Amino acid sequence: EVVKNAAEVLEKVQARTEVVGIDEGQFLGDGLIDVCMGMADAGKRVIVTGLDTDYLGRPFDPMPRLLAVAEEITKLLAICVQCGNPAVHTQRLVASEDLIVVGAAGMYEPRCRRCFEPQLAHEKIAAEKKNVPAQAAGPNRKQDI
């Protein structure tokens, strides 16, 4: 069931619930840590998935703070669509300065450290403002390395 914030998670959990699974934890706000800690203190197993960095490669709160208090961490990596190496970043392919842009297929793709272009979304915004094709907006980082 979809929830909009961490407080709504508690509304869905029943006293007899033993395991709570939360997907896309980065979207649930700062209350996520207290909610998870409270459920764990109550004896529930809490499993949270989410992105630890945003489209610019910066820590994506509240996930880094949740990682700091987690008892067990498993970091899963995708495969870079550019070169096939392990992907540690999420590349935004659309023009937007918003931190959160809920996307469909083709808006994001997994990238490794070498192929990740954090400035790409900003270059696309600048290109749209100038009405210039996005590839002409700036250097291709992969060719510069």
Regions inferred by a protein language model and the residue ranges of each:
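Short acidic-hydrophobic, aromatic-tinged amphipathic segments that line or gate anion-handling sites
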Residues: 1-5
